[in-house]
Design a protein with these regions (language model features):
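Extended, compositionally biased alpha-helical segments that mediate assembly or anchoring
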Residues: 85-132
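Long, well-structured alpha-helical subdomains associated
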Residues: 3-99
Length: 132
């Protein structure tokens, strides 16, 4: 979907690959603070789906993630098609099976989340507007 906006020039001169990297980072961020709500579970499923599609890999020595841009595009297209099909068909049971397959934080991802928590990186920024 973002590829269409990019092809139409709606994203300016930005390299489309930065959108893929940002999306992956946002999935990881979401898993840190909202794994229990619907938004968090959807992002966990997206993360696991894209990982299974080879959209990114994790270096076991460093714990760092690397995006495969071609596979990320194919994976995100496949994820969007899967979700749209579930919605269009009203396939509630299919969504349940999808969530069973992809909607769980893996032990490896949980270890990476714990590593982030140990670094005390803030989960969210709070902005107070106006006078106290």
């Amino acid at each position: 979907m973002v590829q269409v906006l990019n092809a139409q020039g709606e994203l300016g001169k930005e390299d489309i690959r930065s959108n893929y990297v940002t999306f992956l980072a946002s999935l990881f961020r979401s898993m840190r603070f909202s794994a229990a709500d619907a938004h968090g579970r959807a992002n966990i499923a997206a993360f696991n789906f894209l990982q299974r599609m080879g959209a990114f890999t994790r270096d076991s020595a460093t714990g760092r993630y690397r995006v495969d841009f071609d596979k990320f595009r194919a994976g995100s297209d496949s994820l969007a098609a899967t979700i749209l099909k579930f919605q269009g068909d009203g396939d509630y049971a299919g969504v349940g099976e999808f969530q069973k397959s992809f909607g769980v934080v893996t032990a490896l991802a949980q270890a990476d989340l714990a590593r982030l928590a140990a670094l005390k990186i803030p989960v969210d920024v709070i902005f107070d507007q106006g006078q106290p």
